[in-house]
Amino acid sequence: MNGNNVKIFGDYQTPMYFAKQVCEIIKKSYFTIPDIIIEPNCGLGNFLVAAQEFFTTSTLFGFDISKEYVKATQNKLPHFAQNIICNDLLKNSLRNLIDVKSGSEVLIIGNPPWATNSQISKISGNNLPKKTNLKNLSGLECKMGNSNFDICEYMILYLIQDFINTNTTFGILCKQSVARNVFEEVAKNKIKCSDFRMYNFDARKVFNVGVDACLLLFKISTNAHCLNQCNIYDFDNPSNIISTLNYTNKKMYSCLDKNSINLDGRCCYEWRQGIKHDCASVMELKKSDKIYINKQNQRLELEDTFIYPLVKSSDIKSMQLDKIDRYVIVTQKKPKENTDKIQTIAPKTWDYLNSHIYEFQKRKSVIYKDSPNFAMFGVGEYSFKKYKVAISGFYKIPLFSLISTDKAVMLDDTCYFLSFDSFNEAYMMMLLLNSKPVQNFLTSIAFLNSKRPYTKKILQRIDIKKAFENTAFDELRKIETTLKNLPYFTKEMYDELRNLVFDLNKKSAETELQYYNTKGA
């Protein structure tokens, strides 16, 4: 399997030397010899061959969707050839194919596909599981990226459900983000588990891919208890714990620091993600005098009506930003809004968009399905407010920037922001979010080694009321001095915003209570 097939199946074959290292760690970590070893996606069979060397008395089973791989693995393991079967894990449960007797010890090992459904669909792959809402996401969450589920994560959760009432150890290679999500699901659903570990390794060295990866090792057991902690080790030095994940009060923490102030709660403001259009070569522009220039280097005379300043993650380098040199065409003020009005209001812009209609039609994401031509996502009334306090989702150190120009500024979908009509409110919020209590709290709940440490889910956990209660006026004044501005922030402004936040927090709590009362009625 090579070329596009490798991409479609998310297929990274595990080198034999590494499969043996994985089996060695599993054997040293768990003293019970498995009766049955299963590789759900066996590929060329390296894991099963390695497992046979370390667990000589175990019965081996291997499955793969590829007949080519099944044949290759059968040839390597002739003694278990009848147990190496062509099977689609997500269409035919392994429990239907293997007789797991009561009390048997099972080991599931392997390296499931490292791909998301959107990555596969972009290259027209059909190797997708039937989409079920395992995490009970809302319709909006499903459309805006949480539905961009990782195939590996889906398979692990599926296998946990399949083997829930057995004594089964999982030793799976996966992305670190997948391992964290699996731990959260196991802890949240109180699945009995005797141990939970991650062994981080260099995927570039092993697979030549730039991904934060790990060996996920845990055991579900009928005799175990519910865990709320996951220890993280270095694969090359597996005896030392390098960090710990905790699941406490229904929340995940990357680092529980006793010295940091717990600001966990629900933000009384709504964090928003920037706009999404998936057509940067057409929609994103630079400007030279009165001429716009797109990424294809076309020089364009366009009306300014639907063109707005644009900020990306790489632009957020300071606590205030008011000089912006890139632009974006914004075709809608709310999702699904008809775009035909552009033809009348800005005919040059309309003609330009239509000249590139094929590029819009190539967009694969489900959010554009049944939408008007040139549709976007992540737009609403909040997009057009003059003042925004934004953060890049990518940086390790959280930096919040106050962004404003004469015209409303758009952010791309790598950024998250709060929007305001009032400069004073935005300015104060920027200072508060850059304060030490908020910064320390964020680094205790964010996963700094992930590609996108800061997400809406993380930011929405900042309780602004608690932040005010733990941040004095003088501390915010100190932050202001680093801006090298004339003193602007006053005690009256501080008290005014503090009162506003307390009122918003109260209303937010009342609304949430009303929602749950209605839901339970």
Enumerate the language-model features and the residues they cover.
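Class I S-adenosyl-L-methionine
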Residues: 1-76, 80, 93-96, 152, ...
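A short beta-sheet element
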Residues: 398-431
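Signature of N6-adenine DNA methyltransferases within the class I
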Residues: 7-21, 25, 41-60, 64-71, ...
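Glycine-anchored helix-breaking recognition loops at helix->coil/strand junctions
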Residues: 200-201, 414, 436-464
